């Protein structure tokens, strides 16, 4: 028993991370391939970190944003909640895969079959939600709200998160005090 080394797990042959990135980048940056995700802004941050550069990923669709346009504040827009609400499916919880508290591990330490099941379920139910929500955009006459207003905000909000924003603290404090009085 060695207290100072990483636990040994059976090795499963895998492609090198750099090799996978080299294969996937052309797919993600191709303008002829539609990318469908849930909370895709998170994925854009990850891809930028992995590739070491800002990468334009278009065309894209985001089921979290679709849900927001169609449902507003009726309920949350997380994948787990939407899968349960619209597809009557309980998703595998991240904590079931990675643990919690002192037993929590990072996703790269998860057994390959568990990681595969978790990721495949996310992809599967994201696509199912897309197939459910996209026709509703047309039926509810919300296409322009989604395509012209909310979907473009994905990249704008990502840039704001990357760069930060300037805030006039005096004005913010005054607004806060005003809101507090009105509440």
Where are the predicted features?
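Active-site-proximal helix-loop-helix substrate-binding element of RNase H-like nuclease domains
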Residues: 1-138, 149-157
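Short, flexible segments with low predicted structural confidence
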Residues: 98, 143-144
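Extended, well-ordered alpha-helical scaffold/bundle regions in very large, multi-domain proteins
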Residues: 145-183
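Short, flexible helix-adjacent loops and helix caps
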Residues: 135-138, 142, 164-165
């Amino acid at each position: 028993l060695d207290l100072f080394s990483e636990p040994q797990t059976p090795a499963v042959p895998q492609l090198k991370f750099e090799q996978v990135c080299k294969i996937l980048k052309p797919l993600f940056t191709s303008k002829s391939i539609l990318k469908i995700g849930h909370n895709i802004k998170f994925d854009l941050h990850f891809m930028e970190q992995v590739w070491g550069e800002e990468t334009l990923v278009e065309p894209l669709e985001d089921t979290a944003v679709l849900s927001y346009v169609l449902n507003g504040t009726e309920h949350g827009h997380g994948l787990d909640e939407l899968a349960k609400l619209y597809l009557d499916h309980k998703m595998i919880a991240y904590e079931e895969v990675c643990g919690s508290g002192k037993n929590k591990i990072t996703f790269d330490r998860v057994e390959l079959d568990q990681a595969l099941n978790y990721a495949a379920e996310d992809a599967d139910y994201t696509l199912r939600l897309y197939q459910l929500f996209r026709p509703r955009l047309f039926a509810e006459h919300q296409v322009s709200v989604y395509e012209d207003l909310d979907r473009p905000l994905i990249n704008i909000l990502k840039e704001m998160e990357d760069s930060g924003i300037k805030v006039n603290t005096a004005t913010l404090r005054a607004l806060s005090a005003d809101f507090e009085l009105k509440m």
